[in-house]
A protein has these predicted regions:
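Short beta-strand segments
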Residues: 8-10, 32-34, 72
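Conserved thiamine diphosphate
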Residues: 1-25
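Glycine-/acidic-rich phosphate or pyrophosphate-binding loops and their flanking alpha/beta elements
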Residues: 17-28, 37-82
Length: 82
């Protein structure tokens, strides 16, 4: 399907920012929600409470910067890979 986007949030910040971006996107978006993440606590940055907080779709997020290796993961595996 042309234009289809798939997002897979890792934490509450990703969920809030990507869900708002998905709703505002003109193309279809599949939002993968992992039920195994329910009940897991995350630190909350006050910036996510801003009404205009978005995470742009299509931009990778660097959870821990480094110079030796690149590990890619999504959803619950982000926590395991860190």
């Amino acid at each position: 399907m042309p234009g289809l986007k798939v997002v897979s949030p890792w934490n509450i910040e990703d969920c809030r920012g990507l869900l708002k971006a998905s709703i505002r996107d003109n193309d279809p978006v599949v939002f993968l929600e992992n039920e195994m993440m329910y009940g897991i606590e995350f630190d909350v940055d006050p910036k996510i409470m801003d009404k205009e907080f978005l995470i742009p779709i299509g931009k990778a997020k660097i959870e821990r910067p480094g110079t030796d290796v690149t590990i890619t993961a999504h959803a619950k595996m982000v926590g395991h890979s860190l």
